Each structure stands twice: as structure tokens, then as C-alpha cells.
């Protein structure tokens, strides 16, 4: 079966952006979320307005289909998601992102472009801090690229269980 599309119900992978600053990154992440059936959670303050044209342009015509929730702050997020399993993607993490198991209902959180996730949050959750390996003194990867890397690993671990696995040619057939 190459089409695993089905209703996702109330839970599946959730991407959390903690105080994102750049609308184009958030727009690109929104498009990735739509393409993967993933919910997007935004923790304020945001460095832009959700109505900004750059945000919509990066998300293209997919933005209207995005399942997005906005929180007033970190405390609001925690209050509205009690007991949530959260993985914190950070350059400071001690675990490689591909070495952990992502549950279907987990959250994967990414920090703002200029500073990442606050260290107080990371220190309180050392076992669920994950990092993408890099060489040398590279500070970090682009936020939208990081989200895609970690999200697709989480989806792979769960057998892409709600995704279409095979594409079709537009003018020709693979079988000709």
C-alpha cells in the first residue's frame, strides 16, 4: 500500500516554535507541517505578525490549511498541554536526534533563530534535548531546515504511517 493517507485525529507529531523571529522560516515550516499532517504550535512573542505577507508567501497557498495554535508564552503552552512529551531540538543537546524514539503524540520544540530555546528550559529537560550533528564551529542550521530534518526522522520512525509514499508522473505513466 503506497498511500497511507487517513484522518489523523487529534494527535500526531507537533512542531513547536518558541518565539520565532523570521516570518519566512515560520512560513516554510508551516508548509512542511501541512505536507506532513503535522500541527504547528507558536509560542509568543513572535518577531512578526501572523498576517505578514512574507509569512504567507513562504507558506504559499498552504497557510490556510495549516493547523496552528498560538500561545501567549511558555507558561501558557505548559498549562494547555499538561504532561506532554516534548523533545527540545538544540545545538546544546547531548543526544543525537536520530538516536531517540519519537512517539506519535510527542511535541518537537525549536527555539528562536537568534538564541535557541532558553537554557532554563533545556536544563530542566536534559534527557529530551536532541541535536543535529554538525562539523566545526558552525553555530546552527537554518530553523526551517532543522525542523524538516528532525520531523522527517520522527515520521520515518513511525513508518510514514499517514503519508503518500509514491508519486505519479503528470503526462506519462511509470508503467509505460
Stretches found by the model and what they are:
Residues 1-12:
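Single conserved hydrophobic/aromatic residue that forms the stacking wall/gate
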Residues 7, 36, 82, 124-126:
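Short, structured coil segments at secondary-structure junctions
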Residues 21-28, 141-145:
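Amphipathic alpha-helical repeat scaffolds
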Residues 32, 121:
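Hydrophobic/aromatic ligand-binding patch that stacks against planar heteroaromatic rings
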Residues 39-45:
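Short internal beta-strands
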Residues 52-119:
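S-adenosyl-L-methionine/SAH cofactor-binding core of RNA-modifying enzymes
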Residues 124-175:
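Structured adenosyl-cofactor binding patch, chiefly the S-adenosyl-L-methionine
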